[in-house]
């Protein structure tokens, strides 16, 4: 059971009216979808999808964003992060919501980008991919221990 802190619950109840609030709590209880982002600098989304499906993974692509793929079937613990495809940088494990900022920015090869909240790096690597490893992309974070 998800436990919301009382202050947070009060705040959310002001935003989400009472008839809808139980639905919000129900949604919070659902497991998050396992989503990966294809690194198009190394492989096309079609080739990655085919490669992962050969391993028995059930993949669906996110409408309007072919680089984003949902892993539909249950995998072994750690399988998503330990696969050879992940280890060689063919995909990055990344929430769909995290992919939205770089998509909104639409950085190109000619741009200079300063990412001041870069750790752990999912949005930064996505921007590098979108910029085709060109332009200038500086990654920094206020918390030095988050940078690796």
Say what each PLM segment does:
Residues 1-148:
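S-adenosylmethionine
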């Amino acid at each position: 059971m998800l436990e919301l802190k009382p202050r947070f619950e009060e705040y959310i109840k002001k935003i989400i009216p009472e008839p809808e609030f139980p639905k919000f709590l129900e949604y919070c209880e659902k497991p998050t979808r396992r989503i990966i982002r294809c690194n198009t600098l190394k492989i096309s989304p079609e080739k990655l999808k085919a490669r992962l499906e050969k391993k028995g993974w059930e993949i669906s692509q996110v409408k309007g964003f072919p680089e984003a793929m949902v892993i539909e079937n249950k995998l072994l613990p750690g399988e998503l992060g330990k696969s050879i495809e992940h280890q060689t940088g063919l995909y990055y494990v990344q929430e769909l919501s995290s992919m939205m900022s770089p998509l909104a920015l639409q950085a190109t090869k000619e741009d200079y980008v300063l990412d001041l909240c870069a750790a752990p790096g999912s949005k930064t690597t996505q921007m590098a991919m979108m910029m085709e490893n060109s332009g200038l992309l500086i990654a920094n974070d206020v918390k030095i221990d988050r940078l690796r």
